[in-house]
């Protein structure tokens, strides 16, 4: 691992080269076993460096399947354990939405921390949306060898609140009763919040393939974080053991506009470790699953390869 510096670096992403040996591929992917314990046992048995993927609201662990295959191909061992009680499939999730209700940021952060503490090697941690917030919490606990937070949900101390973010969160925050519910998105809501940067056909495909209900609780926790000193939606950005961190932002993201990602970057930049940021042009909140996922995956992999072998 390279020594941490006392300053932050801002850089532009290089295009992901499909001709390089670490190119994304879904041919013969080595998909992780289903249960968290099986994934932990496999990771420890391989002796390779683990990479833990954390999804956000309205998605399942399967949203990381292609990423997991890429990281396995690059020599890491991928874990996609999911949030507590996550169903195995989108169909099951939509048939039984109540399993998502009442999940809190603290509960899910502790769930992933417990998984990581069972690993023989400190992992790299990648998270998208609320998974990005969880990744920062885990890094703040000193449990991550390197962290990538992609379109991360805001945490305490992040002040910008763009109108598009309010509109994207309105299906949940617009009804206080949703605090204790599992809330699905209609196609129109998903189109605005996730799939605004893709065409209509792809938006329909993404909604059908990936969209599931989500716990309303984390959104209310994030929305009130700056008014609640005891909020669970906060990360220890000052911990010197936080490790290198990359903040990735989609230029056209409605749910987490660049103003939020930039504020997260500034907050994390106070850490003595390396903190870097990338804004991916012309991309929305679905950037980890849409047609351009390879570029974002490549940027993330290249960052992790610099720090974790």
Predicted regions and their residues:
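Alpha/beta-hydrolase
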Residues: 180-246
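Conserved hydrolase catalytic core segment
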Residues: 124-158
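Catalytic active-site module of serine/aspartate enzymes centered on a nucleophile-bearing elbow/loop
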Residues: 274-309
């Amino acid at each position: 691992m390279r020594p941490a510096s006392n300053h932050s670096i801002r850089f532009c992403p290089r295009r992901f080269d499909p001709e390089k040996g670490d190119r994304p591929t879904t041919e013969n992917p080595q998909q992780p076993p289903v249960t968290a314990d099986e994934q932990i046992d496999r990771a420890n048995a391989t002796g390779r460096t683990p990479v833990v993927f954390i999804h956000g609201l309205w998605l399942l662990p399967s949203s990381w399947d292609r990423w997991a295959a890429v990281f396995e191909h690059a020599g890491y061992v991928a874990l996609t354990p999911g949030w507590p009680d996550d169903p195995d499939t989108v169909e099951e999730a939509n048939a039984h939405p109540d399993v998502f209700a009442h999940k809190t940021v603290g509960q899910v952060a502790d769930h992933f921390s417990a998984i990581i503490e069972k690993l023989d090697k400190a992992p790299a941690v990648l998270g998208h949306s609320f998974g990005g917030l969880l990744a920062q919490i885990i890094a703040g606990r000193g449990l991550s060898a390197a962290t990538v937070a992609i379109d991360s949900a805001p945490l305490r101390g992040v002040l910008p609140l763009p109108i598009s973010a309010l509109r994207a969160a309105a299906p949940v925050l617009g009804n206080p009763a949703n605090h204790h519910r599992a809330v699905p998105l209609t196609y129109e809501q998903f189109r605005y919040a996730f799939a605004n940067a893709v065409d209509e056909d792809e938006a329909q495909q993404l909604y059908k393939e990936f969209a599931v209900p989500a716990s309303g609780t984390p959104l209310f926790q994030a929305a009130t974080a700056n008014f609640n000193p005891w909020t669970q939606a906060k990360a220890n950005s000052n911990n010197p053991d936080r490790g290198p961190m990359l903040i990735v932002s989609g230029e056209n993201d409605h749910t987490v506009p660049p103003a939020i990602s930039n504020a997260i970057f500034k907050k994390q930049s106070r850490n003595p470790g390396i903190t870097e940021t990338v804004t991916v042009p012309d991309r929305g909140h679905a950037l980890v699953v849409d047609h351009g996922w390879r570029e974002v995956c490549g940027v993330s992999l290249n960052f992790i390869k610099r720090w974790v072998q």
